[in-house]
Every structure is written in C-alpha cells, then in structure tokens.
C-alpha cells in the first residue's frame, strides 16, 4: 500500500490552485495559515517550502498538527486555512474538502509494508494476517478504509 501527500481545506470554502509547483507556491504565500502533519508528509512539506525559497515568509503561518490531533480539526476550526497530510488520512475526514494531491513533480509517496519480527510471540498468526492483507480478497476492505487504491488518490 502507498499514500501520497495531499491538500485539504475546510468544507465549503473555495479550493486553492495546486495544479503546478508554481501554483502551489503562490497558494502557500497567500494562505493565512498552513497546517502540516508530523512524519514524512510534514517533513516533505517543510522541504518544499525551503526548496521554493519562501521559508521566511511562511514560517509564521505554519501550524504542525500536535500528536493525537487530526488535520481536519485544524482545518474545520479555522486554525489552518490549508492543510497537508497523507491522502489516506484526508480523503474521508469529516468537515474538510480534499483538494487533491501535490503536483507529480514535487510529490512524495510513502510506501507502507508489513513484516513479522523475528521475536514474534505468534509468528503464524502474524504470517496469516500479512498474507490476508496481501491477498486480492483484501482489496475491497483496504479500498473502503483508504478510499482510493491509487496512492495519488485517483480511482485505478
């Protein structure tokens, strides 16, 4: 399974232009506040801001989602005008509208994998779970939970 970085806004507000790197840069500069998550997607957003050369202008507007708080909370309450997080976390969140994935030329895909620790107390049960998740029969359940089978949030 994999998930890309996506963009969301509070439900019902106009969706910003994120169709290109330059459009995203402009959107970041004009946003009043910017939410980003912890982990790889948040690190990637910070690196993009640095790459765009707008760190000094953006830093005062950045709001990192605290551990245990979801991005939709910041967006729905207006603490963040625009938010960045794994698409799998944004796609079904209440109170927000998913805008879309980052442009492909600046996208970062996070791949999720499963393994069985060598010191597992129940290696056979773990192997059965991993096998079940990898089986084609699991796809409908995974799609329901993740909403989209494609890491960029598109229907395959």
What are these regions (language model features)?
Residues 1-156:
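Exported/periplasmic ABC-transporter solute-binding proteins
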């Amino acid at each position: 399974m994999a998930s890309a970085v996506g963009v969301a806004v509070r439900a019902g507000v106009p969706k910003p232009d994120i169709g290109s790197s330059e459009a995203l840069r402009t959107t970041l500069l004009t946003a009043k506040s910017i939410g980003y998550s912890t982990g790889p997607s948040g690190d990637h957003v910070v690196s993009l801001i640095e790459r765009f050369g707008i760190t000094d202008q953006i830093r005062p507007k950045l709001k990192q989602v605290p551990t245990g708080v979801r991005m939709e909370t910041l967006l729905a309450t207006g603490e963040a005008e625009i938010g960045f997080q794994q698409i799998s976390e944004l796609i079904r969140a209440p109170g927000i509208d998913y805008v879309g994935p980052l442009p492909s030329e600046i996208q970062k895909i996070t791949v999720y994998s499963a393994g069985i620790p060598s010191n597992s107390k129940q290696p056979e049960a773990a192997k059965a779970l991993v096998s079940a998740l990898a089986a084609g029969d699991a796809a409908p359940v995974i799609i329901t939970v993740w909403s989209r089978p494609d890491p960029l949030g598109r229907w395959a």
